Amino acid sequence: MKKKLLYFTLSIVTLLLFFAVYFFTIKHYDRKIQESTNVLTSDKHEEMRNFIIPTHFVDGERFYFKLPISNNDTIMAFGDTGGGISFLAPNAKNKGDIRLNLKTGIVKGIMPIEYILYKDLVKDTNFPIPNPNSKFIIRHPFKRVTNPLLMIPPMEDELKFMLKVQPEMEAFLGQTFFMDHSWTIDYPHEQIMVYTPLSDSFINQPNVQKLGFKKNAKKEKINGHPSMTMEVDGETIDVLFDTGATMVLTEEGQKQFGTDKKTLAGSFIAASIFNKWRKEHPEWKYYPKADYGGDVIEVPIVKIGEFEVGPVLFVVKRDEAWSEGMINTMDKVVKGAIGGTLLKFFKVTIDYNSDLIRFER
């Protein structure tokens, strides 16, 4: 009996030691990858002939890509150039043959997570292939998965809230979906085209800007969050190009804007600039506590290149959201983000290869 107990105890200890060694080894390698500035890329392919992507616009200010999947079905995927990790929402797993193609991997050395390879989800080869995320590490079971994929996150409180206020969202496509490609987003005509490059010869045109990206020593993009500039009241302000910027309205906000919608397109501005605008322009419209994140201000005129457009709504965000948060994925500290409340006035072409953006009206 004592021998059996000893063998059992030794077996348990050995098993625990094995898992401990595995866990700390994987954590070590994952940390080295996350600290590295090396860039993970998908197989390079030539730019294809420009292609109109099936898209659904919301109020002409935000958009969902209609991803074609099996059984002639589609996935409504929210397009967000300012977003992070791309994912497939858990509520979409039963569409088409998605469930048959789901895989289970390991993150952080121990946590299981479901994912689907992008090639197993999207059936139209004309659709752009997202860039693999260099910092989000999934292993299957031990080897790192380097192919483009969409993870299926657990249905936790933050995701539940996101899907509650945007129930049509079946997938989320963040920065890595847009990287390595060129896009034309025509807001007035509610059309999106991909493979629409801007050559370096465009740089001297008045309504073309050079974008900033966080890069490594080899000048390769580490992240895909683009910085650019806008001008308000004579001041040039660095901002994030953010197609997914969204206001989540409070009940007070719904009353102020005369809508029963839970969300509207938005743009964001740092509190220091917001407070300056409030002090210098008390006549500008102001909507206190209209957004769950804070107050909203209406700026009459915003200048992009030679164009003056407006009015444009901005939601206040604390300065630390930019100086301590977004700086981790951007080339500089920006002071805000321009979303659909400003972009709706333009036909925008953005090229992640030449790092150029052009605004047309």
Q: What are the roles of these predicted feature ranges?
A:
Residues 2-361:
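Pepsin/retropepsin-fold aspartyl endopeptidases
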